[in-house]
Amino acid sequence: MTKQPLYSIIIPHYNSPTLLIRCLASIPDCEDIQVIVIDDNSSSDIVDFSHFPGTERKYTTLLFNKNNKGAGHARNLGLAQAQGKWLIFADADDYFLPAMWEIIAQYNNSTYDIIYLGINSVDSDILRPISRCQYINDVLNTAKNNPTQENLDTLRIRHIVPWGKIIRKSLVQNNHILFEETKYSNDVIFSTYVALFSNTICINTTQCYCVTSRQGNLTSATTAEALRTRFEVTVKRNQILRQHNYKQHQIPIATYLYLALCISPKVFFQLICIGIHYHANFFKGWQRWTRKIIGVFLKHQKTTNPWQQ
């Protein structure tokens, strides 16, 4: 690059080259925008590495991680290579909307720490609109239309995904913020710390980023491993919020306990132990789920050796 770019767009990739091509096609290939694609050890049976997406682009950096460590690790590799004043994150199966580049140009020289943008969501295959990101747009619009401190805090603390926002790189660097290198929910703690350390924010509700949903992606995984990881990230996040006097924004954990018990009592008590380690508030949201949890527990009591499941 002949000059320092304004923006660094970090995109982790794993086994979805066609969707990555779509994502890259939505990004201008210009010197103001540094694109960093980090491949997380994709399979050569799926990806043609001799013609890897982005190879033909002048302002795109390709990194190849030979150990499959997940999107969190991949994003951390991207952060180490980021040269822009601003950070933008994207998933390889998502894409930017045309309004993105005109909108962000308004903030090139702004002093904000975070600029929140509107989000659209569609089915990845047929591009049919879905409601996956409705909650984010709801808190975004509420904070925009009624910018009380409570509404602004709700937006900052509960917008726990890295995309749909522009982040000042110095905020991340100066506070040594990195992504968790877990298989699931690796972006939650990063987004939480970015929110907690930010001082000035801006809201633009114009839809600039499109989130897609497809069968079999990590977001939809409901295995015991996924549940344990997401639960631990949640109670860790709740602990961080308590330490920073935002306990009112803690996420109730009773839902996780109910889902764990639906899998097996063994998984349920694994979550209890994790919660104790992080001093979790087991009673927040408990009333809503008590009857369901007891019902599932009694059902397991009728099985043979439920604790071994």
List each model region and its residues.
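Short aromatic/hydrophobic "clamp" motif used to bind/position activated sugar donors
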Residues: 87
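Acidic donor-binding segment of Leloir-type glycosyltransferases
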Residues: 24-64
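Catalytic core of nucleotide-sugar-dependent glycosyltransferases
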Residues: 206-215, 220-248, 253, 267-278
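Glycine-rich, basic loop-to-helix element that forms the pyrophosphate-binding segment
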Residues: 65-82
